[in-house]
Design a protein with these regions (language model features):
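Beta-strand-rich domains and repeat architectures in extracellular enzymes and scaffolds
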Residues: 11-40
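WD40/WD-repeat beta-propeller blade N-cap
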Residues: 11-18, 57-63, 98-104, 140-147, ...
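WD40-repeat beta-propellers
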Residues: 42-45, 84-87, 125-129, 150, ...
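Conserved strand-to-loop turn within each blade of WD40 beta-propeller repeats
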Residues: 36-39, 77-81, 118-122, 162-165, ...
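Loop/turn segments within WD40 beta-propeller blades
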Residues: 22-30, 67-72, 108-113, 151-157, ...
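A short beta-strand motif characteristic of beta-propeller blades
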Residues: 7-11, 51-56, 93-97, 134-140, ...
Length: 327
């Protein structure tokens, strides 16, 4: 196995940089992957193969953030057209469009899919009730610059957000107040809550920081050889992956921080990386307009990686047409 090289599956179809992505949980139909792109057209794919399922048509500006609910029945997107939209992931139909006063950078579903959180350049975190879409949203104020990411956590009793004001903040939904705050020396580029809810993964400058999700105490922090735009912790917490400005996708040991391997496949900076819910692969999105899927264990028979030995699979095994219809 040692002589096997990593052959990512390349998912084309976007026409501009891919800036964010999200996986659903494992469903009876497998799991799914959604990508945010500056072309304004989020795409839904089968998560283990990258096969294109459909494109959500309706935004009039770059899409900055995307989310899938757990069972992949709903998708959400936040965009430069000042809206956060919720979509039926089966039909592609737009279900809700929530108007904001500035660019919506981040969207996230609650566990029960009844609520949508948004973070925008208005410096406000909002929660919309999808069962009462006309109702006034809950609002959380305190950030002093545009918000990059917002995520439900602690069983949806709280939200965690990070912003251009170089802070990470935790919001208590019952009081509507900020209850914890952490300052960083540089802008936090990415934020992830681990699948079991116990660890926050934050990237800033060339660092990846892991925080205890209750106390916000630093569990560990490692430096990466480049400005790191995104990092993701494996579901079993043995390894993490990171990507940034030097076009490489890195894999590190979570305990020691030692680099295990790195791969160059993209032709532009890597903007986002994320492990699949089963941990068998990780996806990366880049300035080059592509998504790539990488095997966690190189050579394992999984998804479209059917060869363990012998010829490598075609790097463009998965492509979708440049112009694709709505779902």
């Amino acid at each position: 196995m040692a002589n096997l090289r990593q052959t990512p599956l390349t998912c084309s179809g976007h026409t501009r940089p891919v800036v964010h992505l999200d996986f659903s949980s494992v469903t009876k139909y497998g799991y799914f992957l959604i990508s945010a792109c500056k072309d304004g057209k989020p795409m839904l794919r089968q998560g283990d193969t990258g096969d294109w399922i459909g494109t959500f048509e309706g935004h009039k500006g770059a899409v900055w953030g995307v989310a899938l609910n757990k069972d992949a029945t709903k998708a959400a997107s936040g965009a430069a057209d000042f809206t956060g939209k919720v979509w039926d992931a089966n039909s592609g139909e737009e279900l809700h469009s929530f108007q904001h006063k500035h660019i919506v950078k981040s969207v996230n579903f609650s566990k029960d899919s009844a609520l949508l959180a948004t973070g925008s350049n208005e410096k406000i975190v909002r929660i919309f009730d999808l069962n009462k879409p006309e109702a006034k949203p809950e609002e959380f104020t305190g950030h002093t610059s545009g918000i990059r990411h917002v995520i439900f956590f602690r069983n949806d009793t709280h939200l965690v957000s990070c912003a251009d004001d170089k802070t990470l903040r935790v919001w208590d939904r019952s009081s509507g107040k900020e209850v914890q705050k952490m300052d960083f020396p540089s802008i936090p580029n990415s934020l992830e809550v681990s699948r079991d809810g116990t660890v926050l993964t934050v990237t800033h400058s060339n660092h990846v920081t892991f925080l205890d999700s209750e106390s916000l105490n630093k569990i560990r922090e490692f430096s990466v050889p480049t400005t790191v735009n995104s990092a993701s912790l494996h579901p079993d917490k043995t390894i993490f992956v990171a990507g940034g400005d030097d076009l490489k996708v890195y894999k590190f040991d979570y305990t020691t921080g030692n680099e295990i391997e790195s791969f160059k496949g993209h032709f532009g900076p890597v903007h986002c990386v994320k492990f699949s819910p089963d941990g068998e692969l990780y996806a990366s999105g880049s300035e080059d307009g592509t998504l790539r899927l990488w095997q966690t264990t190189i050579g394992k028979t999984y998804g479209l990686w059917k060869c363990v030995d012998g010829p490598q699979i075609n790097n463009d095994a998965i492509t979708s047409p440049k112009e694709v219809p709505a779902i």
